[in-house]
């Protein structure tokens, strides 16, 4: 865990005790006097005293997770990722957690959460912990809450540890200024994908007086993690093999909290994976460059990271990555068109090199093999044929074709 010490500098930059502004309200971050956050144990301590957590000790049983964002309908690309994540966990005799990543209130809708649960069950995917059977208001399992919108107090505690260690600073840059930085030479950081544009640490270098000036001008700050200078992260990806990145390649100092008070994805997902005992994360390769950021957060919080597997993405016939705008390829649209769930999962399993079968039968077969065969998965993105929905209904859909490596994202 983080030691009980507070740095007075952020990599050589003067740091003052700040009056925090969050969602238009001032607050003081907890100090490290009482210790740090233990996301796996029962006691969580901070400068405000000791808090009791409902989080049980981390289990050694393998654990995978399904972590949809309820911002729209699930599509074939989501089904591909969730099927592989589910099978990878079941192949090791592991449990599966369903977590709704509804951290952004402006985009998330409860009706989409319910639709997602119905779509997952339609595919034959179940879970051991998560929202109740109807995806209503109750949570079922020892690691609740299973909705990020309800876990703010846990993110707050993790943030306090990072702040007490001198690794957090306020960022007053506006969206317009950030867009200008992204458009500047070397500002876009080619290949960052969804990890975001490179941030050169503009507000990290502000003096205390400059920070106070921005506060007086009414600027609300976001909060960024000050990445250690020259920091690198390495990991062995189950699909892509050994990976090595500098944090600068992944965008530099990244946001932990937005200026409107919404917690950022990077912090939320690390806290949730740690407290839920997630041991393996299967997700699209478009998230690859988020992994070094998350590994750094795991290390700073003293938590053990999961194993990662970044799988290739599905693309439409034109080569565009599947997204929620592909309404005809949503699971709801396929169901209404008369496509059977067994046809979808069997087709996806064959595309992954796993043979045919419904998820339950595939899980039994893989369990007998003793491990998930990552080596069978394709290494490049896959392009669907035209009219794949109708072909799935007929039962004669051709397998997706590999895309050239340069079109993989």
Roles of regions detected by a PLM:
Residues 1-22:
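Extreme N-terminal basic, low-complexity initiation segments
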Residues 20-21, 25-28, 35-73, 96, ...:
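Non-catalytic terminal extensions that flank enzyme cores
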Residues 29-30, 273:
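Residue-level detector of structural "landmarks"
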Residues 51-188, 285-286, 290-303, 408-409:
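N-terminal Rossmann-like or analogous alpha/beta NTP/dinucleotide-binding catalytic cores
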Residues 101, 132, 174-175, 310, ...:
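Proline- and acidic/polar-enriched loop/turn elements at helix boundaries
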Residues 104-114, 316-320, 367-375:
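Short, mixed-charge aromatic SLiMs
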Residues 143-161, 185-192, 219-228, 351-366:
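Short secondary-structure transition/capping segments
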Residues 176-323, 330-335, 384-408:
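Active-site cores that bind ATP or allylic diphosphates and position pyrophosphate for catalysis
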């Amino acid at each position: 865990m983080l030691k009980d010490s507070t740095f007075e500098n952020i990599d050589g930059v003067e740091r003052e005790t700040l009056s925090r502004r969050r969602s238009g309200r001032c607050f003081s971050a907890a100090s490290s006097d009482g210790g740090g956050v233990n996301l796996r144990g029962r006691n969580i301590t901070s400068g405000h005293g000791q808090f009791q957590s409902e989080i049980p000790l981390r289990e050694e049983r393998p654990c995978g997770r399904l972590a949809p964002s309820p911002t729209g309908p699930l599509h074939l690309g989501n089904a591909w990722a969730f099927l592989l994540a589910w099978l990878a966990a079941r192949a090791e005799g592991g449990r599966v957690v369903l977590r709704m990543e509804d951290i952004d209130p402006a985009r998330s809708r409860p009706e989409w959460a319910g639709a997602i649960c119905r779509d997952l069950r339609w595919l034959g995917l179940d879970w051991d912990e998560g929202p109740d059977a109807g995806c209503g208001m109750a949570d079922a399992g020892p690691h609740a809450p299973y909705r990020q919108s309800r876990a703010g107090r846990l993110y707050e505690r993790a943030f306090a540890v990072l702040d007490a260690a001198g690794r957090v600073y306020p960022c007053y840059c506006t969206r317009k200024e950030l867009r200008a930085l992204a458009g500047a030479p070397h500002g876009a950081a080619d290949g960052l994908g969804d990890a975001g544009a490179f941030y050169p640490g503009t507000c990290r270098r502000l003096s205390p007086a400059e920070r106070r000036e921005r506060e007086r001008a009414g600027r609300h700050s976001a909060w960024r993690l000050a990445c250690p200078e020259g920091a690198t992260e390495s990991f062995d990806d189950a699909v892509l093999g050994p990976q090595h990145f500098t944090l600068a390649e992944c965008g530099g100092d990244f946001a932990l909290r937005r200026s409107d008070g919404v917690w950022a994805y990077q912090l939320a997902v690390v806290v949730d994976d740690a407290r839920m005992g997630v041991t393996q994360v299967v997700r699209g390769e478009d998230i690859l460059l988020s992994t070094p950021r998350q590994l750094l957060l795991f290390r700073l919080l003293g938590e053990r990271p999961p194993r990662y597997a970044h799988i290739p993405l599905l693309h439409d016939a034109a080569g565009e990555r599947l997204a929620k705008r592909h309404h005809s390829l949503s699971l709801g649209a396929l169901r209404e068109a008369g496509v059977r769930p067994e046809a979808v999962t069997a087709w996806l399993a064959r595309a992954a090199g796993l043979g045919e079968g419904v998820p339950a039968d595939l899980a039994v077969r893989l369990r007998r093999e003793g491990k998930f065969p990552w080596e069978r998965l394709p290494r490049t993105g896959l392009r669907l044929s035209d009219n794949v929905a109708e072909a799935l209904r007929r039962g004669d859909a051709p397998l997706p074709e590999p895309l050239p490596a340069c079109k993989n994202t």
